[in-house]
């Protein structure tokens, strides 16, 4: 339930009206909670259903996590990984007796503030996570920032809401469930279930395909891809870990966790303020 309203004209100033209240009436909420209490979740069934989806839905495991590079101030390189937005929604759906919501709650001259909300009906637990979305961006080749138009602002806010909702969901669910799902997804990327009549491609072939899809989708050259892999070689133990990283990197780029210049062209990287959790 994402209650946002954006001026539709692409050249009009972006305006999104804040909404602070949950879009659900108290009597309806009470009925939902009573239903949850009379049908409590089965944790083993929750885990089994999450795993089953990964096993029977082709490609779901590859979309279940992100993996992005991180360079610390001392020059060290590592990978930051976690469940994707799609993974969070899958976990919430199978958790049952809950709902999530996302909305714009405030703004200032530079940013919109969006909340992701997760409510566990059975536990009577509400978790809220906030993300800040900049009203400005830095065009390529520009020395300064310019305001986002209405269409761009709408997309940026929706991305921010999705991330805030994901953060609220993952903060609410048990760590053991989230970690087990994350690990299972990576295992299935390396060793996918055999499809009837089809032979599983080698990891090396799938690595090459992973490179190719990133190059095609994000206009990365083959030389840029190889330079990136070489420069971050310490982050991969073997071809299997490289494969899981490439698929997670695709998700990270797609979901806006990081931009393509930051990954493949660090010397020329522009760093627009991306949606992030407000501390």
Label the model's feature ranges.
Residues 1-272:
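Polyanion-binding surfaces on beta-sheet-dominated domains and ring/shell assemblies
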Residues 272-279:
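Short acidic DE-rich linear segments
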């Amino acid at each position: 339930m994402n209650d946002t309203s954006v001026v539709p004209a692409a050249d009009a100033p972006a305006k999104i009206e804040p909404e602070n209240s949950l879009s659900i009436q108290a009597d309806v909420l009470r009925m939902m909670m009573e239903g949850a209490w009379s049908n409590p979740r089965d944790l083993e069934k929750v885990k089994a259903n999450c795993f089953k989806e990964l096993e029977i839905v082709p490609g779901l495991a590859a979309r279940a996590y992100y993996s992005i590079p991180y360079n610390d101030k001392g020059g060290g390189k590592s990978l930051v990984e976690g469940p994707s937005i799609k993974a969070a929604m899958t976990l919430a759906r199978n958790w049952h007796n809950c709902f999530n919501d996302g909305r714009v709650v405030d703004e200032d001259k530079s940013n919109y503030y969006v909340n992701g909300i997760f409510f566990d009906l059975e536990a009577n637990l509400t978790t809220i996570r906030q993300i800040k979305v900049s009203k400005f961006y830095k065009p390529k080749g520009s020395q300064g920032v310019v305001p986002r138009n209405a269409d761009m602002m709408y997309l940026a806010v929706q991305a921010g809401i999705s991330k805030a909702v994901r953060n609220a969901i993952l903060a609410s669910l048990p760590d053991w469930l989230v970690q087990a799902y994350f690990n299972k997804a990576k295992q299935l990327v390396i060793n996918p279930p055999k499809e009837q009549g089809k032979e599983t491609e080698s990891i090396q072939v799938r690595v090459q395909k992973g490179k190719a899809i990133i190059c095609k989708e994000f206009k990365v050259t083959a030389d840029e891809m190889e330079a990136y892999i070489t420069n971050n070689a310490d982050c991969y133990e073997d071809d299997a870990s490289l494969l899981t990283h490439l698929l997670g990197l695709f998700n990270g780029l797609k979901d806006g966790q990081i931009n393509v210049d930051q990954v493949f062209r660090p010397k020329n990287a522009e760093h627009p303020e991306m949606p992030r959790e407000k501390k």
